[in-house]
């Protein structure tokens, strides 16, 4: 028998985003680039900001499934810098995805948006982030993405 899986909430990342740039149809979908321009991270023992660089490099596939690939960095209040690479997917009813594209509000419970963030840091206090797996539950808003990050125990 293998160990059972459980998760524990660890922190929330709120990444502010800027206007979408499209690279157009790349053969297997539409490539979109969404700049990450700042934000906050808050949780038990982790507080800081999202640094104002990085982006989410998305592909909207013909079946409307959205592949997410965000790369950015956090700077915590104690000076630690943590690189984040967050891979995921988002999908839902086509009409709701169209509303999101137009920056119209959509109830996050109606859109499936999950990610698998990975972290890198040389700061000894936060090296535990590199030794665990994490799952994110995310919600897209017009000006930000909110990700509740859970550690897989």
Regions found by a protein language model. Name each.
Residues 1-153:
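Beta-strand-enriched cores of mature, soluble protein domains
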